[in-house]
From Swiss-Prot:
It is found in: Cytoplasm. Involved in the biogenesis of TorA. Acts on TorA before the insertion of the molybdenum cofactor and, as a result, probably favors a conformation of the apoenzyme that is competent for acquiring the cofactor. It comes from Salmonella dublin (strain CT_02021853). NCBIfam families: PRK04976.1. Belongs to the TorD/DmsD family. TorD subfamily. GO terms for cellular component: cytoplasm. Keywords: Chaperone, Cytoplasm. It comes from the Bacteria. It holds the Pfam family Nitrate_red_del. GO terms for biological process: protein complex oligomerization; protein folding. Its main location: cytoplasm. The lineage of its organism: Bacteria, Pseudomonadati, Pseudomonadota, Gammaproteobacteria, Enterobacterales. This is Chaperone protein TorD.
Length: 210
């Protein structure tokens, strides 16, 4: 008998990488086409099979469908992104761990060091940006496929998830309060659901039982 995780390591890795990109930069014309593509629909359908993710996925599907009804959808999404993630007023949802008092200062640097990673010089945002956490989780899930690193990477994955969950709920709540059209609010809710779902998997190894 083969016991497998509800989502494979590679599937987690791809989803985290996709979410990292969406929270890092504005959706351009090409990105908008991809959001509305059959490929993304298939990915969301895969996630929707998990009961813990179904409601969040359904909400995001609704918001993606609603984009076709928004005039100048790409420009409107760009404005939403700017207002939420680039402004510093009280109606924003800044994607930096240091903006939330629950987070230990400099934690992401320690996590990256343990993973043997560093922030690329081309990355112009602070190192504690949400996208860095998600790229780290993507890397760790891919690394879980290498058996000689599995125990160490799984432990580091748990530390990263725990660190992220210290401030991600408040970030998500800010998105809900300040995103009038709801795409990024729905995206943040899905992210929070995935991180919590991932955090519930103590051991992502594949175990074969005779």
């Amino acid at each position: 008998m083969i016991k497998q995780p509800a989502l494979a390591q590679e599937q987690y890795a791809c989803v985290y990488a996709w979410l990292a990109l969406l929270f890092f930069r504005e959706v351009d014309d090409e990105g908008l086409i991809q959001l509305q593509s059959a490929e993304i629909a298939d990915w969301l359908a895969l996630l929707k099979r998990q009961p813990a993710l179904a409601a969040s996925v359904a909400l995001l599907e609704q918001k993606i469908a609603a984009l076709s009804l928004r005039q100048d959808a790409q420009l409107e999404l760009a404005a939403d992104f700017c207002g939420l993630f680039l402004m510093t007023d009280k109606k924003s949802a800044l994607p930096y761990a240091s903006q939330y008092p629950q987070q230990e200062p400099g934690m992401i640097k320690h996590l990256l060091l343990e993973a043997g990673m560093e922030v690329n010089d081309d990355f112009k945002e602070p190192a504690d940006h949400l996208a860095i956490y998600l790229e780290l989780l993507s890397h760790l899930h891919f690394s879980l496929g290498e058996s000689f690193q599995q125990r160490r990477m799984n432990k580091l994955r748990q530390k990263t998830l725990s660190s992220l969950l210290e401030w991600l709920p408040e970030f998500t709540n800010n998105c809900l309060k300040h995103d009038p059209y709801g795409f990024y609010a729905a995206l943040s809710q899905l992210l929070l659901a995935i991180v919590r779902f991932d955090d519930g998997k103590e051991d992502l190894s594949i175990v074969a039982v005779e």
